[in-house]
Amino acid sequence: GNMAKRSITQSRPIAPSSKVNLYGPTFPKQMTVSDIEKTARSFGRSVNLARSAGFDAVEVHAGHGYLISQFLSPYTNARKDQYGGSLENRARFLKEVMREVKAAARNDIAVIVKTNMQDGFSGGMETQECLEVAKMLERWGADALVLSGGFVSKAPMYILRGSMPIRVMSRFMKNPLMKVFVRAFGGKLIKDEEFHELYFLDQALKFREALNLPLVYVGGLLSRENIETALENNFEFVAMARALIQDPAFINKMLDEDLSRSSCDTCNYCIAKMYSREVTCIQNELESSRV
């Protein structure tokens, strides 16, 4: 979609509509029906590649403003054909992707889908529409859902919460013009969102109440207590990111009862380094520099 990099794809990115992504900047071409059908089939082929590599599960990313999410959201989908307009139409591409993925997965590959509970900005998908999509995914055979929210090209901090270290991010950008642009306007474009532990829980509980399939809770998990709270609220699984970037052995240390809380302070330095060749925690970098 409009998150693709031409330098990587070696072709002009394609998307549901030709809406510009300022974070690229990316100027995508609107997909033809043939493009859409071909792309849906490619998801199925990817399942076979995953099987060949030894995986027993795949995750379809239908959130965060990437390709499938761009079809679902009225913010990025201005189509006038069978793939735009009503929620049923905007979800048609996801339905076709799920058909291809489930056919390829057969009975030996689990199909997990990451989906939004809200896009996180005015003009995007709100909770009720997202809940309807989740119900569709349950009907279409998803084995589990990862419940998240936010839109990388419009509301990135709704996903992460906290603030983005703009100067750190610009430092690792390779495009000189983007470095200048981000330093000048990044603070206005990337709005802060208040962080608190378990920040998606209240929304996720609405989905838990309405759905019967296994759900994965993600968002603001920094301690054993956080994890226990999610599990006690009938989420079958939890997913973590920043706490494991800070300490990849965090789960094992909790199991051994050596540690019950991550020392991650959610400064988002690790996220700001996404334009570098590595995503690392500043605490670990500082510790290494002292040795």
Predicted segments, located by residue:
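Flavin-dependent oxidoreductase catalytic cores
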Residues: 1-291
